[in-house]
Curated annotation (Swiss-Prot):
The keyword Chaperone applies. This is Chaperone protein HscA homolog. Belongs to the heat shock protein 70 family. Chaperone involved in the maturation of iron-sulfur cluster-containing proteins. Has a low intrinsic ATPase activity which is markedly stimulated by HscB. It comes from Ralstonia nicotianae (strain ATCC BAA-1114 / GMI1000). Keywords: ATP-binding, Chaperone, Nucleotide-binding. One of its GO terms (biological process) is iron-sulfur cluster assembly.
Length: 621
């Protein structure tokens, strides 16, 4: 999700007053920090000149932690206390973690986000990520020679509210002021679009260590519009490592394996994968803790066979994103590759074959996201320079709505809406004297609440008692620049108000997102039939409720025969409401409504006479 930049906060009036802000690519495998210096964005290296920081944290028995290369070296020897690829766990519950059986960790199935047992105690993914972010913050401050005013941190476009909030929490824990969360493909678009002065429709194919994103972007005269997004936040280079590791286990007959040996084989698998990016074959040699030895030859051809379905798994969201954008493959003017995993020849061949053109690779795929984030951070800090006259528009991937009577969904913000965005809609009460309203916030493309994802519930109380339909409750949905949702409800007469910030306890898996979209497309006709049925039932129940109150108050206005006729129509409607034919229900509602027109007119006459009783004509003037 999410960035709409219209105007910038106070700009620095002079170069010597420039405020220091950085862009951080918090990656699954590696993380980077970059800054704009002398109008040039650059990745900030460590003391040894290394731009990448392995996203690895090892907790020590005596307290403290090793971060980066030092931790990576110890990963095989101390796998349970060395956390790698923590990004996969951000905002996730235990059931959402992919390949959990192949991880060496002791998980704690805590409410909400998964936690990990270490020698230093139970750690959350937020705490682990904060260690990485704090290291990058210190690197930046040491390099730039001053404190930072803030950072733009990149996240996968398909990160949901829980994952985004977890990222912001980690940044705050690391002492960073978050200027903005920025989609990784969007960050790449900033870097490529500005560097190359490109215009037209582009695709950004971003395959990192643990996440995959695809974005379709329209670049026109400095305006970056994200037309659609897609992806899988549990698919990345790590999955290719897993395939190789499983192949090694199968070829060498190595079951069962200790956590230490599994980590060793994953490291060997990663090394083999990287070697095959520039060679036709590689040797895999390992000595396990049991003394067993492994010697295998992995060819590029075998690797392609092992990972073919993973490659295809990235192409399905690409096709879906193109459909959502209303763009044909031949309209794409260029494909930008982002993420170290895109160095794999199997990926580059598949992308070239799908789009019918070689992808763009003139920027380092490991660094392009951090560079784009640094450029955005510099602008948000107020460091505008000549030529920084560009606009960025981004979108949300799934519709946001509210449940109405009958279990229906009223969409407030449709999917692919540009954000930040605020939309409001008025609703009313269903019953006479209703003083409270339950607000059920939903996400998804289906017509009925039961088929959508529940995000939050809250109540608006203190509504003044009125007849049904008289109260006006204004419900406002607001998605901020980081893609986080807040919902408020306000009764317009009394001013009573309630609100909630939506923070799901754990994230929505991307298989679920894809399934929700697919079901929405496939079930559209049936959903509309069910919606029509629910709407007619609600209308029927509303009419019966109103008529019941009217008969209690003014039933004496009807003769015995008239009352019998109305009762017969009421009974007929009640029977019809139990059926599944929405047209029959509508006919029964219309019949009862027309059958009580005369009764309604008599009630109105009685009400007018009561209101005028005892008043003089001049008082009415």
């Amino acid at each position: 999700m999410a960035l709409l930049q219209i105007s910038e906060p106070g700009e620095s009036p002079a170069p010597h007053q420039r405020r220091l802000a950085v862009g951080i690519d918090l990656g699954t495998t590696n993380s980077l920090v970059a800054a704009v210096r002398s109008s040039v964005p650059e990745v900030l290296p460590d003391e040894q000149g290394r731009p990448l920081l392995p996203s690895v944290v090892r907790y020590l028995p005596a307290g403290g932690a090793q971060i980066g290369y030092k931790a990576q070296v110890e990963a095989v020897r101390d796998p349970k206390n060395t956390i790698v690829s923590v990004k996969r766990f951000m905002g996730r519950g235990l059931k959402d973690v992919a390949h959990i059986e192949n991880t060496p960790y002791d998980f704690v199935d805590a409410p909400g986000m998964v936690q990990l047992k270490t020698v230093a105690g139970v750690k959350s993914p937020v705490e682990v990520s904060a260690e990485i972010l704090a290291t990058l913050r210190q690197r930046a401050e040491d390099t730039l020679g001053d404190d930072l005013v803030g950072a733009v941190i990149t996240v996968p476009a398909y990160f949901d509210d829980a994952q985004r909030q977890a990222t912001k929490d980690a940044a705050r824990l690391a002492g960073l002021n978050v200027l903005r969360l920025l989609n990784e493909p969007t960050a790449a678009a900033i870097a490529y679009g500005l560097d190359n002065a490109a215009e037209g429709v582009y695709a950004v194919y971003d395959l990192g260590g643990g996440t995959f994103d695809i974005s379709v972007l329209k670049l026109t005269k400095g305006v970056f519009e994200v037309m659609s997004t897609g992806g899988d936040s549990a698919l990345g280079g790590d999955d290719f490592d897993q395939r190789i590791a499983c192949w090694i286990v199968e070829q060498a007959g190595l079951q069962p394996l200790s956590a230490e040996d599994m980590r060793l084989l994953l490291n060997k698998a990663r090394a083999a994968k990287e070697w095959l990016s520039g060679a036709d074959s590689t040797e895999v040699d390992a000595v396990l803790s049991t003394g067993e030895t492994v010697h295998l030859v992995l060819t590029a051809e075998t690797f392609a066979e092992l990972t073919a379905n993973l490659v295809q798994k990235t192409l399905a969201p690409v096709r879906r994103a193109l459909r959502d954008a209303g763009v044909a493959v031949d309209e794409i003017q260029g494909v930008v590759l982002v993420g170290g995993a895109t160095r794999m020849p199997v990926i580059r061949r598949a992308v070239a074959q799908l789009f019918g053109r070689a992808p763009l690779t003139n920027l380092d795929p490991d660094q392009v996201v951090a560079i784009g984030a640094a450029m955005q951070a510099s602008l948000l800090a107020g460091n505008r320079a000549a030529g920084d006259d560009w606009l960025l528009l981004d979108v949300i991937p799934l519709s946001l709505g509210v449940e109405t009577m009958g279990g229906l969904v009223e969409k407030i913000i449709p999917r692919n809406s540009t954000i930040p965005v605020a939309r409001a809609q008025e609703f009313t009460t269903f019953k006479d004297g209703q003083t409270a309203m339950a607000i059920h916030v939903l996400q998804g493309e289906r017509e009925l609440a039961g088929d959508c994802r529940s995000l939050a519930r809250f109540e608006l109380r203190g509504i003044p008692p009125m007849v049904a339909g008289a109260a006006r409750i204004r419900v406002t949905y607001q998605v901020d620049a980081d893609g986080l949702l807040s919902v408020s409800a306000r009764e317009t007469v009394s001013g009573v108000e309630a609100s909630i910030a939506v923070k799901p306890s754990y994230g929505l898996g991307d298989d679920d997102i894809a399934r929700m979209l697919q079901e929405g497309f496939q079930s559209a006709e049936e959903d509309m039939r069910r919606r029509a049925l629910a709407e007619e039932r609600v209308e029927g129940e509303r009419l019966l409720e109103a008529l019941s109150h009217a008969l209690d108050a003014d039933g004496d206005l009807l003769s015995a025969d008239e009352r019998a006729a109305v009762d017969a129509q009421v009974a007929a409607l009640r029977v019809t409401l139990q059926g599944e034919d929405h047209r029959a229900i509508k006919d029964a509602v219309d019949a009862l409504s027309h059958g009580t027109d005369e009764f309604a007119a008599r009630r109105m006459d009685r009400g007018i006479r009561a209101a005028l009783a005892g008043k003089r004509i001049e008082e009415l003037g």
